[in-house]
């Protein structure tokens, strides 16, 4: 640490400081949301946020899981024990490959996911089948018990300014699920171990090991070198290790995003569902662009996605202050939670940082591949699609072992998972999430006036034909209004 203070400027909770002897200190550890922003921006790689810090009620969740000794060499090393990384581990291990997973978090009980626990899947990624207590992805020959699923969703919507909102009903044939993100990852970890994968928690990978241009393993934070034929980077949206492998991740950064979630215990009597809320925000500065969310699943979650053109935190108060203010004052939140919020028990504060970037299908180099959220924009792949991505990648890696060829050309078939339909849908999803950024409140109001009859669950769970027919009907009915507002028409 050289005392530059970059970490202080980026912290959305405003809990960091630099001492006179040029050392970073955490002044209020209990409020850390573990977004790892301080690590991400440190020019000297001097910051290591070892554990996800949670309120005292969940101190047991940050106990370090005991693991076996690390071997000198594996067939496959996976970095990151999220859905995509564990999908790779499951697929490789059941094919008989000696597979290790290195995860920086302390144990499998903490997922670090900030989203609302909604299960959905992009076209071409997988098909969810649930029957008799079993969760299945038939295309990927994957089954496990569905104990992580909390309930079927009863509503899913987009709330706009002025009381406008999209139709939230699940139409016939459409089913959405609310899940426990922690249980989902926990079960995947158990499944990977059942097939023979070796999981190492509280183990941080510092960089990759090279012989010439080929990746030949990893170097851990303590300097331990571990060899492998293939390294799989599944290190999430910031993709720190992917960059060190020189896998080409599009560097275009349209926006920096800070995403924080306050997670509460769920009381009885609430209906399961999720809403994004656009416009009508409490900020005095109308240039602030944010997207609050409220979700009711295994927990009650109130979140905010803050967009910025700079990597630094720009609001005048900590980000959890603004989320709590939205939770207490926004009528849209009260509509879903009633008077429960004042009595809810806070379980965790979780956060992450994203960079919006264009999709990249070039996710392989000699000896390494990237999977999961590090090749998409804004962490939009979701739990199930990420798992499917990992399962698919594992099968392709088995073929590379059969060829005994770990060159970029041999490993590049991993990118065949990314279909044209998937790319199109992800781009459309990102565009809709950027509406609060590109539209002022007046334009948003007009947008919702025109499109509030749209059925929001159809966007997630409908067929391409259902989505197209719905949108064409709405646009035909409102063609003159759209022509009168060219900004909306052009953006659509």
Spans of features found by a protein language model:
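Iron-sulfur cluster-binding cysteine motifs and their immediate structural context
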Residues: 6-23, 37-54
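N-terminal FAD cofactor-binding segment of flavoenzymes
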Residues: 91, 104-157
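C-terminal auxiliary extensions adjacent to catalytic cores
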Residues: 435-492
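FAD/FMN-dependent oxidoreductases across multiple families
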Residues: 205, 312-392, 396, 401, ...
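Short beta-strand to alpha-helix junction loop
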Residues: 170-191, 240, 312-317
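N-terminal Rossmann-like FAD-binding beta1-loop-alpha1 element of flavoenzymes
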Residues: 67-101
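Predominantly flavin-linked oxidoreductase catalytic cores and closely associated redox partners
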Residues: 105-107, 191-333
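Active-site-proximal substrate-binding core of FAD-dependent oxidoreductases
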Residues: 395-444
């Amino acid at each position: 640490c050289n005392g530059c203070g970059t970490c202080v400027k980026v912290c959305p909770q405003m809990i960091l400081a630099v001492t006179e002897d040029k050392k970073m200190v955490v002044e209020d550890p209990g409020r850390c949301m573990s977004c790892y922003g301080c690590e991400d921006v440190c020019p000297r790689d001097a910051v290591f946020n070892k554990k996800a810090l949670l309120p005292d009620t969940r101190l047991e969740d940050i106990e370090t899981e005991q693991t076996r000794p690390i071997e000198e060499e594996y067939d496959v090393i996976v970095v990151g024990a999220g859905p995509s990384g564990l999908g790779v581990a499951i697929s490789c291990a059941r094919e008989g490959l000696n597979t290790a997973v290195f995860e920086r978090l302390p144990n499998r009980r903490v997922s670090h996911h900030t989203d609302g626990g909604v299960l959905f899947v992009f076209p071409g990624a997988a098909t969810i089948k649930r029957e008799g207590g079993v969760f299945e992805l038939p295309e990927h020959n994957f089954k496990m018990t569905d104990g992580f699923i909390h309930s079927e969703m009863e509503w899913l919507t987009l709330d706009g300014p002025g009381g406008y909102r999209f139709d939230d009903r699940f139409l016939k044939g459409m089913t959405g699920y609310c899940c426990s993100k922690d249980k989902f990852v926990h079960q995947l970890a158990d499944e990977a171990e059942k097939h023979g994968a070796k999981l190492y928690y509280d183990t941080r990978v510092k960089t990759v090991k090279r012989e010439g241009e080929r990746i030949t393993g990893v170097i851990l934070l303590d300097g331990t070198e571990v060899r492998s034929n293939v390294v799989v980077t599944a290190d999430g949206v910031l993709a720190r290790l992917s960059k060190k492998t020189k896998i080409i991740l599009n560097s275009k950064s349209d926006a920096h995003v800070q995403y924080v979630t306050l997670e509460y215990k769920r009381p009885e009597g609430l209906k399961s569902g999720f809403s994004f809320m656009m416009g009508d925000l409490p900020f005095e500065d109308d240039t602030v662009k944010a997207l609050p969310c409220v979700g009711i699943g295994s927990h009650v979650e109130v979140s905010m996605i803050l967009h910025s053109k700079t990597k630094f935190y720009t609001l005048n108060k900590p980000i959890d202050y603004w989320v709590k203010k939205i939770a207490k004052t926004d009528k849209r939140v009260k509509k879903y939670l009633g008077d429960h919020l004042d009595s809810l028990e806070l379980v965790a504060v979780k956060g992450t940082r994203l960079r919006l970037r264009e999709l990249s299908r070039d996710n392989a180099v000699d000896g390494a591949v990237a999977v999961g959220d590090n090749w998409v924009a804004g962490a939009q792949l979701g739990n199930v699609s990420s798992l499917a991505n990992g399962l698919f990648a594992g099968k392709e890696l088995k073929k590379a072992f059969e060829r005994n060829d770990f060159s970029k050309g041999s490993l590049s078939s991993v990118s065949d998972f990314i279909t044209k339909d998937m790319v199109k849908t992800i781009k459309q999803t990102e565009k809709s999430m950027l509406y609060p950024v590109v539209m002022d409140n007046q334009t948003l109001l007009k947008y919702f006036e025109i499109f509030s009859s749209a059925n929001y669950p159809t966007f997630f769970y409908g067929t391409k034909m259902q989505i197209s027919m719905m949108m064409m009907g709405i646009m035909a009915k409102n063609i003159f209004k759209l022509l009168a507002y060219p900004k909306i028409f052009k953006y659509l």
